């Protein structure tokens, strides 16, 4: 599933902000859902992923001796299907509820990948959470044409 930018009017040098520059094109608006409501919802989903895997005997225990890469490689078709369903919901204008459900399906399957890997999946979640928590507006900026948070220094190719 790829969303394409049909037109980018800025050059890469205009996209990459200076270290002391603040992106004034975007205005902050507070999150529309409370932190605890969001965290509780994700936690309920994680618990259901674990229960689902246990119920259908498809969890991490069945993959003993396989590498995390092999486990996920064998599951990618599930995630591909969910991305395709999201793309279809968007392109066929099925509405916000369908798009929200397909987005949640992607999250459910991605969380399933992490559980299926066992400890390497949990370690990956912890590394990414720690890395994301360390990002600040001084170290990272929002690329205006994509909305992606990127490092201000060290990866100029990502600003092109």
Language-model regions, residue ranges each:
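Flexible "arm" and connector segments at domain edges
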Residues: 15-160
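Short hydrophobic targeting helices and cationic amphipathic motifs
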Residues: 2-3
